[in-house]
Amino acid sequence: MIPRLESRESVSSEICNFFEALLGCGFEGEIAGDDATRAVLSTDNSIYQITPAAAVFPKNHQDLIRLVRAAHDLPGIEIYPRGGGTGTNAQSLGKGVVVDTSRHMNQVLEVNIEERWARVQCGVVKDHLNSMIRDQGLFFAPDLSTSNRATIGGMINTDASGQGSVKYGKTRDHVLEIKSVLLTGETFDTRVLSDVALDALPETSTEGRIGRVLRQLHDDHRDTIESTFPRLNRCLTGYDLKHIRNDSGDIDLNSVVCGSEGTLALISEAKISLEKLPTEVALFAVQYGSFMDALLDARELMSHGATSIETIDSKVLNLAMKDFVWDNVKAYFPESKKVLAGINLVEFTDFDADRLHVKIATFSQYLDQIAASGGHSFAHAIAYGSTQVNQIWTMRKRAVGLLGGVASSKKPVAFVEDTCVPPENLASFIGEFRDLLDHHELEYGMFGHVDAGVLHVRPALDLKDPKSLYLIREITDRVVDLTYKYHGLLWGEHGKGVRSEYAPLFFGQLYPTVCAVKALFDPENRLNPGKIAGPTPETSLLKIDEVPLRGQRDSLVTDELAISAGTAMTCNGNGACHNYDLDDRMCPSWKATRDRRQTPKGRAGLMREWVTRLSEADVRSLPSQSVFVQLITYPAKLVRTLQKNSGAYDFSHEVHEAMAGCLACKSCTGQCPIKVSVPTFRSQFLHAYYSRYARPLKDWIVGTLEYILPVAAQIPRVYNGVVNSSIGRTIFSWCGLVDSPELSGIDPHRAIADAGFRLASPSYLKELKESSPERFAKQVVVVQDAFTSYFETALVVDVFKVLDRLGFEPTLMPFRPNGKPLHVHGFLKWFASVGQKNAEHLWIIDKLGIPLIGVDPSMTLTYQSEYKESGIEVPNVMLMQDFLARSLKAEEISPSPSTKQYKLFAHCTEATNASESVKSWQKVFALIGQRLEIENVGCCGMAGTYGHEVAQYETSKIIYSQSWEPKIEMDIQTEILATGYSCRSQVKRFSDKLVKHPISALSEVLACA
């Protein structure tokens, strides 16, 4: 049994006073001081971990004013603004109050198409804005690898930039106005002002008072600023004194806020300029035999007028080849006898197709000549059009996350990852950089914006090893020396954060002026203190080796507990699971709640914190209880559960709340670049949690469902009468379940027999073994799953009819529990027992050489996932479409004329963990003469039995409304098909529409042939 875990530290009296002041002044957002929220917000996309004292989630601009005023008379309250949490240098981490604006302040307020600008709240995600204005031919240009979760407020705070910055510049180049809140509670509106306009502002106005001081600081130090700020595409930001006066000589007050990392003000809104979206695009993937050749070639490539040039080394490329994204891009990286050690991605854009084709032809001819003459590059491929090009950029954007997935205790991490030097110096700079890393015998990955002189370098360190602190210091100091030598910067695009200790060195004699800017806005040093600058040159700044590392907490975890926590221990905080896109499957609970605890990153962080606290409590491994032990200890568990309901604290309860919200859809398992698999460690947690507390009745009902249904199928009218009666619904609701589905009304074994097919009984298998080779070659055994067999028996019959019409001789394997519901709810010992018995029966058929196929993707993929994770050896049970795609031959099929257009809504688990299997449906439909389009769609919100839980009903409904419902309700031209039983039942529940399985559609087509 696990022990009760006390809170690590109680909320301080000052934080309590702050909360009271907030509530007293009408704060509309949420306030959080719980351990779970603080643990989740203690990390970002960096190597550091700082637990905040509390978190607040403001709803609007007035809330920002309220919170700074509430903190005004509490000098111990420090404020740390947070956007998307994608910063790589702990910009949003701190021990005070985190202000997370992403939950509520995420609205696009206004878009002016004619004048090409948008007004947005600070929490708007960059890609979200672009998706809204794409059809108008516009886009917000600064591009980031984290663009699907990075907020525009965060981009402004770090003056972010990325791919394409040579053409489009940094974020500051697109900021027209900023509305922010100062620590005094004043609203600070910044824009470009002429000297006359600035002088005309009243002395009492915030803009006039601050603007005149900033102008004076700039003009008094103009020469020093010019000599200090290097002439780079990625200028020295935070604070950008050089651009206080713009090229026209006007005063640009935005320049100081851009790149200030929340140390001067809380950004509320921004007016930003939009660019015309090029209508024509092409991308060259240029291959090299060495990474240095790719770097050396960059200068020549830039002379051809490319929009952007990105580079990727072989380490990143090899990791991409193992990722699901590779299926979409592998055609552009054909295998070669030569070693591929680096690539340059060279993009050309235009508004005229003919002009672009001339550029493509000219550049392609140049590359052919280089390859023929034995130059730097040896091959290239071309992607045309936005769809193909975006697929390659998606692969490039996943590079940062993919590096974290290397199979080693030493992971490539960010701390010197955004150095910037003049592009002409890049190859020499990187050569010495690599020598430094090689000297320390470190592995590393490299990728980045070669056209801008910015390369992302991630040395591999084991952050649990105390030596890593020494290496972080040693390498950073040497890299600082190198950037100085090559006239560059340590911080090229990711901001300073904890690396601010080097600011005095880079600013030199200008540093006191930088401090004067800080003092003007935040004289008490309460806004993100320790970063960029203090109000005086003597104010201490954070140091890279004095801020706690994530690995320092991880090092406390015992080996056994680390194994139980699984992939939670490898999450690097990249935040890919925070994707705003409602049509992206990861992560549905985040999209519905906007609660960072309800994300793979949040759950991984909580699992790590949980096993750390268990280790601190001298727990060496998680308990493993049999069902019998769980039952006999139930009374004691019930007492502890009643104590829990009465308010007895246990950190495990907070972790349980986050785990209970997980749909176990496994999208994270397939889509996370690190392959963080929440369902796997969630099951481990639930198994251990219920060693101390009583399981709810719903878990027992769902866990035993595969045993209940075969019995209930013998009396379907009785069962259906109960679930449809008011008393039945009341009882189920009391147990925690809602909308229980009806049984089909006929036993699947009897239905198959009535249709003229056989059961794969031992006697029949013996008969098959002795049959002719021709007959034996047609055999296939359908493995049942409880949901299809008992809730959609007609679908099982359709499966047999389709197989029969296509020339196979199918038989039905006798029903045996698969165990998936047991695994989902953490009955791990029971699951292992069920799985082992089931596997034994599967092996009997497999050893005969007869293919095994399953229908429901979630249940069928369990054999290749959960079974193997649990150490159960199991034969290959194929998804039906994979079997058909492999077995059918076009010459043996007479295609039926296509009369319908079909759209396929694939199950989350299938789409994210077996994407090629989804494409198999297209192949099968095409062989039979039918058109099938795969729809890009999010999660339906049902996920097995998740949507049937009373506690999750509303969340399930929200998830359905976000992606599935609008597509289901609006698309009346095509016939929609869904592979998942849970998906089809969700559509029936909320849209009252019957959606078929692809097999049922094929059955109709073949019946008419």
What are these language model-derived features?
Residues 522, 529, 678-1009:
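Iron-sulfur cluster-binding electron-transfer modules in prokaryotic oxidoreductases
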Residues 37, 87-89, 146-153, 237-240, ...:
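A glycine-rich phosphate-binding loop feature that marks nucleotide/adenosyl-phosphate handling sites
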Residues 155-157, 165-168, 175-395, 431, ...:
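C-terminal substrate-binding/cap subdomain adjacent to the FAD-binding core in PCMH-type
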Residues 1-72, 86-116, 145, 168, ...:
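N-terminal flexible segment immediately upstream of the FAD-binding catalytic core
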Residues 539-712, 832-840, 884, 924-931, ...:
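Ferredoxin-type iron-sulfur electron-transfer modules in oxidoreductases and energy-metabolism complexes
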Residues 270-272, 304-410, 448-450, 592-593, ...:
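Terminal amphipathic helices with adjacent charged low-complexity linkers/tails
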Residues 22-23, 46-79, 97, 101-146, ...:
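N-terminal glycine-rich flavin-associated loop
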Residues 2-7, 67, 202-245, 509, ...:
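Flexible inter-domain linker/hinge segments
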